[in-house]
């Protein structure tokens, strides 16, 4: 694997979406508009709540982001499912970062709680992912807990985010 670092900028994340960051066969992030972060500010295999890995990432909020026009006209708010998807994206990125190969797929989440919202007046969303378990055998899978903060205030909590990497997704 190439380009294993402890942080990544927007250009790096765009390279990942094209399969050019870690190399052939490693999981890719989605391309814009579904790429839900602008930078990853910290990657660690040993830190975090469970000592199994920590990911911190950020999304800059501007009123012209695509989802504010359609969700909802006259009452713009970032869809909660996009924050959830961002957490799955980051778990998949972590799996590639630790050497896992395959195509990333979200497998589920145990529990999600929304206690706030992301409005066009916000400045920054922060994602915090605490890895609980990584399986890197024939099956590559990550299990994590995550939090979404807007301008420093926690607004979503997800428990047991699951992502798998698959060599063949035709039967998925």
UniProtKB/Swiss-Prot annotation:
Which SUPFAM superfamilies did the record assign? Answer: Thioesterase/thiol ester dehydrase-isomerase (SSF54637)
Catalytic residues of the enzyme: 71
Q: What is its main location?
A: cytoplasm
Cross-referenced Pfam families: FabA
Establish whether keyword rRNA-binding is in the entry. no
What Gene Ontology cellular component terms go with this record? cytoplasm
Key words, A-Z: Cytoplasm, Fatty acid biosynthesis, Fatty acid metabolism, Isomerase, Lipid biosynthesis, Lipid metabolism, Lyase
Q: Return the EC number.
A: 4.2.1.59, 5.3.3.14
GO terms under biological process: unsaturated fatty acid biosynthetic process
Q: Which InterPro entries match?
A: FabA (IPR010083), FabA_FabZ (IPR013114), HotDog_dom_sf (IPR029069)
Known catalytic reactions: a (3R)-hydroxyacyl-[ACP] = a (2E)-enoyl-[ACP] + H2O; (3R)-hydroxydecanoyl-[ACP] = (2E)-decenoyl-[ACP] + H2O; (2E)-decenoyl-[ACP] = (3Z)-decenoyl-[ACP]
Where is this protein localized, as stated in its record?
A: Cytoplasm
Pathway(s) per entry: Lipid metabolism; fatty acid biosynthesis
Molecular function (GO) terms for this protein are:
(3R)-hydroxyacyl-[acyl-carrier-protein] dehydratase activity; trans-2-decenoyl-acyl-carrier-protein isomerase activity
Q: Would the keyword Transit peptide turn up in this protein's UniProt record?
A: no
Q: State how it assembles.
A: Homodimer.
> Which family does the record claim for this protein?
Belongs to the thioester dehydratase family. FabA subfamily.
What does it do? Necessary for the introduction of cis unsaturation into fatty acids. Catalyzes the dehydration of (3R)-3-hydroxydecanoyl-ACP to E-(2)-decenoyl-ACP and then its isomerization to Z-(3)-decenoyl-ACP. Can catalyze the dehydratase reaction for beta-hydroxyacyl-ACPs with saturated chain lengths up to 16:0, being most active on intermediate chain length.
Q: Which HAMAP family match?
A: FabA
- What is the name of this protein? 3-hydroxydecanoyl-[acyl-carrier-protein] dehydratase
The coding gene here is fabA
